[in-house]
Amino acid sequence: MKLNDLVQHISHTGASETDITAITYDSRKACAGSLFVCLVGAWLDGHTYAESAYQNGCRAFLVEHRVDLPADAVQIVTDDTRAALAVIGADFYGNPADELHLIGITGTKGKTTTALLTAAIMTEAGLPCAYIGSNGVDIAGVHEATANTTPESLELHRLFRKMLDAGVRHCVLEVSSQALRHHRVDGVPFEVVAFTNLSEDHIGPGEHPDFEDYKCAKRRLFAEYNARTMVYNVDDPYSDFMREGFKGEQISFGIQNAADYHGQSLAQYRSQTALGVDFDCVHAGETTHIEVMSPGTFSASDALCAVALCGAFGVTPAQAAATLAHTPVQGRFEVVEGLPGRTFIVDYSHNGLALTSALKTLRAYNPHRLLCVFGSVGGRTQVRRKELADASSAYADYTIITSDNPDNEPPEDVIRDIAGHMAPGAPYTCITDRREAIYAAVKMAEPGDIVLFAGKGHEDYQLINGKKLHFVEREIIKEACAEISK
């Protein structure tokens, strides 16, 4: 594709008939024939890597300001390279999103569970549906890992093209506030969008400066994308704010308040391999009994959202119920079998609201003791660390504070911050190495105990000093159980 053709739909200066065979924003992947896009992020500026891309053979650059490169380097200057990438990425892959039925889900909690359940229901109902989100990418049974909940726009359009090539015509995406803020989904023609809930999170360096900015970023999905249908949580106090200005069809779901999809008669259940919740879904005057393989009101709410989303494509609650009864979500209230009489739970609850909800839900099972193992991500605000400490102090019988993804912050500093917020008298210990913390919790567990390992969930790594190190919590729990059983 000629460079001039590639940039024809963006505002720019500069021109060239150079042939472009690839687009990248990673200088390590730049080569002859590629266009290197200099993205400006919270911590890194792609312009500083332009010379590295040049050394790798790249001669075409999309920049926000000219950089010092040899004369044979073509520089196309535009106001915002992230916004431009969304346009040229779509054009480069032939605008595949235009041929797809796209579902976008946003909210503080529940995006992953709702999206995965939606994809499973749609697929079993005869509408093969891909998934993009925190748990990676699934297209026709083929899995890919992702660096972000919502990939960069270039990756999205590559994935959309891959879906079409695989014969998949539906896709559900988790849409993060960062994706909305940084143009990752600009121009994506969402057909149906959903709002799960909103609470104070993702505020701090590199994220949102305050709650107002976070809240408004979320609302962009409903105010700016012209979807035909919006599904929203009528129980959430911010649902009216999210609905402002949406001109399409609106479908509500809820448990506490009357809704188009209303959940009632909730009851927890416990089996050998799962903790769950069942409830009745009332829709259009008909009642459908639904079982979900994760417990709590939040799980029921996420399932209702998925049922409503699928309903927007003609799938009935009865069809949805048949899928939900046998569909677990990895890393969300995932039961790890190990020692007799003990229940080990892996869950992604990584902020105060999620951890409070998880612990209160597990309390309803009347355990002998409820133990909680958690840490907090490095580089985030004190608010999250305090809220996590408050939750575990209030609802756990014993807490082990450990590392999560400390990244470039010393894990001991993060742990010290959390410990400083634990309530007076709340029993806890600090173990920096998360593997050691897991072993300690497994050894400590007695018959009748429930142990919650919070924060990692589906993740298969720990982020330490900028490096992703292999770390799968469920595997380590099983290792610890096997060692203790010897």
Regions found by a protein language model. Name each.
Residues 22-25, 57-64, 173, 229-233, ...:
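Short, hydrophobic beta-strand segments that form beta-sheet elements in well-ordered domains
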Residues 6, 34, 53, 88, ...:
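Residue-level signal for inorganic ion chemistry
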Residues 1-12, 30-35, 305-318, 322-331, ...:
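ATP-dependent carboxylate-amine ligase
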Residues 85-234, 240-246, 365-366, 485:
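Phosphate-binding loop of NTP-binding sites
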Residues 50, 119, 160, 218, ...:
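Generic hydrophobic/aromatic pocket-lining and core-packing "Φ" positions
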